[in-house]
């Protein structure tokens, strides 16, 4: 279902498409440089970057990636980012929100191979 309100406006302005894990995205950068893949497969891009949007009520499904992943909250929020380490240890919650006295920050880096959902 298309996003409504400000989220819908951003989907249109940024030319976002539905993301397979939920939300909306568009790749905005793919490095010409490559690096070895951590699991020995062929080389991969040294850096990629996407615009990603979760409208109110949307979720990003549990997933993990082979590289560190940086989240940046640019508008809206707060965003609840759930994390589980590769050994399936303790569940952690990081709240992305504008900087405040409670320690909220608008960005977080999820380490490679950690499970994450938002």
What are these regions (language model features)?
Residues 1-109, 116-118:
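Non-catalytic, conserved peripheral segments adjacent to functional cores
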């Amino acid at each position: 279902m298309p996003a409504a309100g400000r989220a819908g406006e951003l989907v249109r302005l940024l030319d976002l498409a539905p993301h397979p894990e939920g939300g909306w995205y568009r790749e905005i950068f793919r490095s010409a440089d490559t690096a070895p893949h951590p699991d020995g497969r062929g080389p991969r891009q040294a850096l990629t970057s996407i615009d990603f949007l979760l409208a109110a009520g949307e979720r990003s499904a549990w997933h993990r990636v082979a590289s560190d992943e940086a989240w940046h909250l640019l508008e809206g929020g707060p965003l609840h980012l759930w994390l589980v380490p590769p050994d399936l240890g303790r569940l952690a919650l990081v709240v992305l929100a504008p900087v405040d006295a409670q320690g909220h920050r608008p960005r977080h880096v999820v380490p490679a191979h950690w499970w994450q959902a938002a």
